[in-house]
Amino acid sequence: MVGMYIIIPIVTFIIGGLLAWLGMRFLLKSKYDSVLQEAEKEAEVIKKNKMLEVKEKFLHLKADLEKQVSQRNAKIQSVETKLKQRELTMNQRQEELQRRNNEVEAVKENLSSQLELVEKKKQDLDKLHQKEVEHLEAISGLSAEEAKERLIESLKDEAKTQAASYINEIVEEAKMTANKEAKKIVIQSIQRVATETAIENSITVFHIESDEIKGRIIGREGRNIRALEAATGIEIVVDDTPEAIVLSGFDPVRREIARLALHQLVQDGRIHPARIEEVVTKVKKQVEDEVVETGKRTVIDLGVHGLHPELIRMIGKMKYRSSYGQNLLQHARETANLCAVMASELGLNPKKAKRAGLLHDIGKVPDDEPELPHAILGMKLCEKYKEKPDICNAVGAHHDEVEMQTLLAPIVQVCDAISGARPGARREIVEAYIKRLNDLEQLALSYPGVVKTYAIQAGRELRVIVGADKIDDKDTENLSAEIAKKIQDEMTYPGQVKITVIRETRAVSYAK
């Protein structure tokens, strides 16, 4: 009995465990089947999606391929059309060439037949001409060559007579027309250029506020006046003229330097030899700058471009030069404008003519090489500073020193004469006076050791400044005598000329 109680629970436990295992297995199998079905469904969906993607890509690729094939077919068709058109054109051209060739052959055959006919007629005419010539020779008693010569001589005489008559008519008409046209051009040129009548003097009047300043300008025992005259080379005349000091000298540049220096000294109030030298040095630089500025303004006003800076400086320096009393810069501007107008009237280049007119008297500016005519010196300067050959020739030929090679040269010559020939434009006595003073200075400068020379008091005194390191005190007297003798032998002058040789030694030190 007890054994039954033990066996029954064990059997029950075993049966329960078996049932539980069977139930678990059933559940697991059901879950497995469910998961398998889900996996199969998902696999089917994925498969369908992939199939759709593949199909879509296939359709896209197919469409692209069909499009490319269509485009290629279109290109092939276009090329085939062009080839057919070209072939048709070539066939038409070939037919046209064949037709023209046939026409040429026909014309050639026709020409050949006509040429044969002409040749035959020519032979007949030659025979007939020969018969006629023989007949005429028999009648006239002259050969054909003799008859030709007589006819040629007769025609020559007749042609010469007619040509001579025709040439005379042309020459007379040209003379009348040329004279009339030349007068017309000159009158038109003068009318179109406005000018002023200006005569350069050899003195400048410096006005002062009161006569008290005269004493300060003169200085103790005249030392300020002497220092100013030595520094500028200008004679300072202080007389009884109220509120005025006269600056006398033939060189306008020196007079302008003296005037500006006096103006600054009077304004500053400090007037003594050291200050005078300082101011004169400063004013010389100022005048040089003004010369360059004047040259630049002149070329800009006239529209002349591309000049060398040294030529521009020389043009500015013309402001302080005169020719027979006529201001050289005004004369050059006037000549340039006249040249431009006359060149325009003659159908030539007015810019080149104006350039040549402006530069024609440039040889009067340099102080060196005085033995050369100013036209030749001007031509050399233009060549040196790379002016064109026609400009150089016009400058050199305007006084007939060289041969005129272009039409610019006679224009410059005529306009120079027109400018100088105006009533009141020039005064030859002034030019002769200035030339005499300049020759006086150049004569003294030719001696070794001479640094500067100044002709003052209308050429009655010549001051010669020598280098202290080159000439001693004993030689100054000999130099003065030699210069005086050379002036007596080589120059013509009124009265007498006083030669003053100045030798000055300076020792300068600075206290620091």
UniProtKB/Swiss-Prot annotation:
SMART domains: HDc, KH. Pfam families: HD (PF01966), KH_1 (PF00013), RNase_Y_N (PF12072). One of its GO terms (cellular component) is plasma membrane. SUPFAM superfamilies: Eukaryotic type KH-domain (KH-domain type I) (SSF54791), HD-domain/PDEase-like (SSF109604). Residues 202-262 form the KH domain. The keyword Membrane applies. Residues 328-421 form the HD domain. It is an enzyme of class 3 (hydrolase). GO terms for molecular function: RNA binding; RNA endonuclease activity. It is a single-pass membrane protein. The chain crosses the membrane at residues 2-22. One of its GO terms (biological process) is mRNA catabolic process. Its EC number is 3.1.-.-. Keywords: Cell membrane, Endonuclease, Hydrolase, Membrane, Nuclease, RNA-binding, Transmembrane, Transmembrane helix. It is found in: Cell membrane. Belongs to the RNase Y family. Endoribonuclease that initiates mRNA decay. NCBIfam families: HDIG (TIGR00277), RNase_Y (TIGR03319). HAMAP family: RNase_Y. This is Ribonuclease Y. The gene is rny.
